[in-house]
Structures are given as C-alpha cells and as structure tokens.
Amino acid sequence: MPKYRSATTTHGRNMAGARALWRATGMTDADFGKPIIAVVNSFTQFVPGHVHLRDLGKLVAEQIEAAGGVAKEFNTIAVDDGIAMGHGGMLYSLPSRELIADSVEYMVNAHCADAMVCISNCDKITPGMLMASLRLNIPVIFVSGGPMEAGKTKLSDQIIKLDLVDAMIQGADPKVSDSQSAQVERSACPTCGSCSGMFTANSMNCLTEALGLSQPGNGSLLATHADRKQLFLNAGKRIVELTKRYYEQDDESALPRNIASKAAFENAMTLDIAMGGSTNTVLHLLAAAQEAEIDFTMSDIDKLSRKVPQLCKVAPSTQKYHMEDVHRAGGVIGILGELDRAGLLNRDVKNVLGLTLPQTLEQYDIIVTQDDAVKNMFRAGPAGIRTTQAFSQDCRWDTLDDDRSNGCIRSLEHAYSKDGGLAVLYGNFAENGCIVKTAGVDDSILKFTGPAKVYESQDDAVEAILGGKVVAGDVVVIRYEGPKGGPGMQEMLYPTSFLKSMGLGKACALITDGRFSGGTSGLSIGHVSPEAASGGSIGLIEDGDLIAIDIPNRGIQLQVSDAELAARREAQEARGDKAWTPKNRERQVSFALRAYASLATSADKGAVRDKSKLGG
C-alpha cells in the first residue's frame, strides 16, 4: 500500500518544524493525515484565457476540503502567444512550457503533495501541466478555463463571426479601411477564455478529454457559461476520490500514466486529426508521451493521419464554426462518438470519472444519450456580452446540432474529407518529418511546386511579404527558427496572416523549422526536422531552388541533386564555429533562452530537452 507522500512532512517528531509551518498556513491537528492536494492555478491578468481564473482555485479548494482533503493552491506563469506574437516576446513562448512543467514539479515535490487539480487554459500552460502530471505520476484532474465566445460584427449589412486571426489579417490588409479594421479589432475577442477557434489552447483542452484526464465538456463549454462551474466543483470532489483510491486502496488505475496510456494517446491524436486541431498539438503530445515513458512517435502520428478522416472543421479552417458550435454539436464526445462508430478508436481506456470509452459515449454522446441533463449541458451557448467574468451567463441554444450530414460534426459517411486535418510529410530536407494542417489547405494547392525565397528570420520574411518581394508561386522558407535556432521555435502566424493580407493565401507556400499558431491556415508547413541549427538540410536551401510539395502522397522535396546538397553541406561545415547559424541576423538572446537552446531537441522529438546531454 503506497504511503501518502505528504506524511513525509506531517508525521514524526523530527517534522515538528514542518508541521509548525503547515499550522501557519491554517492547518490543524485534524488535517495531518488527510491527503494534501495541490490546486495548480494559472491566473494572470495578462492573458484573456486566464484572467477569470483568480477565484476558481478557491472554488476547487472548497470542494476538496468538503470531501476530506487539504487543498493548497499555487500559481504558474502563463504566456499569451497572441500578445507575444510578432516580436521578441515569442522567443519565450515554447520555453515557458518547460518552465511551467518544472515549476509544478518543484512545488509538488518540495512540499510532498499527494495529488493535483490543474487549472489551465492557454497554449503552453495545458501542455506544461500535462508534462508535469505524467512526470510526477500522482492522481490528477485537469479543468481548463474554457473557450472564448466568438466575436461578431456587422459588415456590409451582414453579421459575421470573428476571432483574433481576423483582426490580424484585416489590420495588415491595405485594402481594408482604418474604420473597418478598428471595428473588427474591437469585436474579435469579446470575452474571457481561450481564443474562440480550434487554435492550440482549445485543441489541447479537447485532447485532455481524449486522454481521459478531464471531464466531458472540458474542451468546448464556454468560459462565460454558468454550466462550466460544475466542472470545477466536480473536479474538487473527484480528485479526493482518486487520491484515496490510490493511496488507501492501492489502485494504480487512478494514476495518470495508467489513464493516459498509449491507447489513450492514439485516441487523442486520432481526435486531433479528425477535428483539424493545431499543429502544435503534435509537438506537445510527443513531449507528454516522453514524460509518461510511452513509445509514441512521429511514425505513429503518420500512420494515424493516413486513415483518419476529417469529421469537424472549425475556425481558422472555416469562419462558419467556432468552439461554441462544436459544443452545440456534442463537443469532444460528439467527435469521439463518430470516430468510435467508424471503428477508429481504442475502446479499452478509462477516464478520471472511472468510465470506459463505451460508457462515456453512452452517457455523454448526444446522438445516443437518454440523459436530458447532458443534452441540456451541450445546449449551453454564447450571450454576446463583453465580460471578463467566468460563469456570467446562462444562455442556451434552442436546439442541439445533431445533423451529422451537414452540421459542424460529421459522420464518417459525410466527412469533410477522407484525409484527416493533419499530415506528416517526409523528404530530402525533412528527413525526420514536418507537419501541415491539411484542414486549412485549399484543395487547389495540395500539390504545389515553386521557387524558394529563403529568410533567416521571421522578421525578414515579414518585411519581404509586406514589401511585395514575395509573389504568387513562391515558396517562402524561414529557417533558424527552430527550438535551438530561434531559440524557442517562434510561431509564424504573422507571416501566414500577411500572405493572406497581400492576396497570396492560396498562391504561396510557407515552410519553416519553426512552428505555427493554431490560428494558421493555408499551405503552411512547419516543424521541419532536423532543424537548421542542428545541421538539418533546410539550412542548405538557396534562393530559387525548386521545392515540390505533395500532400496527398505525404512528400516534400528539394529538387536539387544529392551531389549539390553534399557540396553545400561541405561548404556549410567549412564555416567552423559559424556553421549552421544564420547569416547577418542580429538578435539579442538572453542567458535564460541560451540555456534552453543548449538542451533543446528538434520538433520531431517534441522540442523537449536532450536528457543525454545531462547524462540521463
């Protein structure tokens, strides 16, 4: 029988000092012996996805204590990728994932907490907490802050839906008037919550459902809706049950590594492909799998991407649907239900509620459930009122979207496409693979060949795009922006958005060893591995080289002979200390970022730290 970790600090005469300090936090004699559960919050006033979380930790803590546990809350950092985008701040986004994971480990292990409730929401916070949870392998439940309502405004006498990406595109489009740009900007992000499309934050919060580590509704129920409060209340109660199951009944099925098994990771990736999620999810699932010591690689993702259809299409791939529409159609469970009926899921998995996949679908899939309360929950909709307050409205859709032929979520027979929303490509400058969000690629450019325009930084590429130096037919190559080369693997949302602003969204391709925002669409290929800074062949591409992209056949090829590439590699190596570094790029890189870069691996490994460099 495992002993409560917290007993290390609460029992024994030699721990009198620790108990004295615990008493100073409000604990009493009656509390020593109860499980100490960390409430891992991420409230900050910097990030709309986290601005409403201040009081939610207390909400969870009250339920933990009512159920017989002791709750102790702490906070992690949270970077807003949208605010950090387009300048030096983006260098810090991906490294913050490791910092968050480490900080959770530090706090939980330093104070010997027995379990955790992770209150996350945005891009790197959910992955960082997920990595920490699987590293620590103590009972955990995730409950995120929830999605933002979609923005809405009236243009040309028509009400249209908006999100962050629309504001960016219109702001850079010279054909759009100042007044219209300002109107879109003021309407794009109306409430608290993670940005309203199937961007990285919402993709990851959906995937925690598929991994079994969060409750049904977690990924899609709006941040503003009163129904979301129940997820937080349930999490506080349920974590005490999970904790006691493990420590008092020796039930290892309560541990996250047994819930988020390889089968669950495969289900999560299947969901991601089917819903056209952010390419960043690939990076984060690979990283989380390594923390769980699960053999889950790019090869597994490639195999899944070849057999899973696209059953859901959401902004930025279309402006018709946002997360509020996904929820109305049954949320994550609705998509999983269709995947299960298509025979594409591993059914022998459980979630934090103790339910198997078939049991979860029977209770929560709107197509089959007989539970009116569940149907009512999925009718939770937007209010259209600007707010930063959680649970501030209780509006409901009149009906559910259960149309699997033409609705937001489709059945296998009516899939948006037989190929899924993500694909892995391989070729002579992406030997270890690269990723494209096929859900956002127009059918007319699934095969594309063009001359390379090579840039050693995102900044140079943006300047060229806005300066008219990139023309229809070009393949924009942005390199030395990988985990090591950036450092920090910047998102390329501005270059892709500006291509659209210049009318080139369907006329150019963009390839990078960096990554893309979940808000990116178009022929945008990222995560090229190995990255240039690690000696990857993307560092050998020259202006004018022809690059052929063949998404249907999963290929990407630099049309240069092997002999020429070998000669270029020899010339690169001859640069000595300057080999595999960008030419003529001035970038101030802090010590903290240099430390990150010194251990960073390429994207095909999840951009995690190279343990071999530390002898582990």
Swiss-Prot record:
Residues annotated as binding [2Fe-2S] cluster are C122, C195
Protein name, as recorded: Dihydroxy-acid dehydratase
Q: Which residues bind Mg(2+)?
A: D81, D123, K124, E491
Cofactor binding note: Binds 1 [2Fe-2S] cluster per subunit. This cluster acts as a Lewis acid cofactor.
GO terms for molecular function, please? 2 iron, 2 sulfur cluster binding; dihydroxy-acid dehydratase activity; magnesium ion binding
Source organism: Escherichia coli O127:H6 (strain E2348/69 / EPEC)
Query: What does the UniProt keyword field contain?
Result: 2Fe-2S, Amino-acid biosynthesis, Branched-chain amino acid biosynthesis, Iron, Iron-sulfur, Lyase, Magnesium, Metal-binding
The answer on whether this UniProt entry bears the keyword Transmembrane reads no
Matches recorded under Pfam families:
ILV_EDD_C, ILVD_EDD_N
Instruction: Name the reaction it catalyses.
Output: (2R)-2,3-dihydroxy-3-methylbutanoate = 3-methyl-2-oxobutanoate + H2O; (2R,3R)-2,3-dihydroxy-3-methylpentanoate = (S)-3-methyl-2-oxopentanoate + H2O
Provide the E.C. number(s) assigned to this enzyme.
Answer: 4.2.1.9
Q: What are the positions of the active site?
A: S517 (proton acceptor)
Show the GO cellular component annotation of the record. cytosol
* One GO-annotated biological process of the protein: L-valine biosynthetic process
